[in-house]
């Protein structure tokens, strides 16, 4: 996903 906290939810 994206960089940051969003990436944790969109691996």
Swiss-Prot record:
One biological process term in Gene Ontology: neuropeptide signaling pathway
Protein name (record): Periviscerokinin-1
Keyword Secreted carried by entry: yes
Gene Ontology cellular-component terms listed: extracellular region
Phylogenetic lineage: Eukaryota, Metazoa, Ecdysozoa, Arthropoda, Hexapoda
Location, primary (coarse class): secreted
Function: Mediates visceral muscle contractile activity (myotropic activity).
Protein's cellular compartments: Secreted
Modification Threonine amide occurs at: 11
């Amino acid at each position: 996903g994206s960089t940051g906290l969003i990436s944790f939810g969109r691996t």
